[in-house]
Curated annotation (Swiss-Prot):
Entries under HAMAP family matching the protein: UPF0235 (MF_00634)
Origin: domain of life: Bacteria
InterPro entries noted in UniProt: DUF167, YggU-like_sf
GO cellular component: cytoplasm
Classification lineage: Bacteria, Pseudomonadati, Planctomycetota, Planctomycetia, Pirellulales
Protein name: UPF0235 protein RB8260
Length: 108
């Protein structure tokens, strides 16, 4: 697994898989993905953090933002915390390159 700075985001890449941290703001007025907080991608969702609703919203937001299906985005650590570890599995190198370009553009 190699480390990728990716425009300031603390991200590890292994083949077609990314692992990175997100900092979640639940009950936000505006849902958004973008910006950094201590090396973690900031994700804001409208949903309240109860019964996994905010986690589902985080997965949906990230999947839409990265243009992958929700089934290929998973929270692997921090399910009850604002700081979560996310794994994204891409189908192809082209799909990963497209997401990487978007990430670098949004965070630069």
């Amino acid at each position: 697994m190699m480390s990728e700075p990716g425009a300031g985001l603390d991200r590890q890449c292994d083949g077609l898989t990314w692992r990175f941290r997100v900092r979640v703001t639940p009950k936000a007025k505006k849902a958004s993905v973008g910006g950094l907080h201590d090396g973690a991608l900031k994700v804001s969702v409208h949903t309240v953090p109860e019964d996994g609703k905010a986690n589902k919203a985080v997965i949906a937001s990230l999947a839409k933002w990265l243009r992958v299906s929700k089934g290929r985005v998973a929270i692997v650590a921090g399910e009850t915390s604002r700081l979560k570890t996310i794994v994204v599995e891409f189908k192809s190198q082209d799909e990963m390159n497209t997401a990487d370009a978007k990430l670098k553009k949004e965070l630069s």
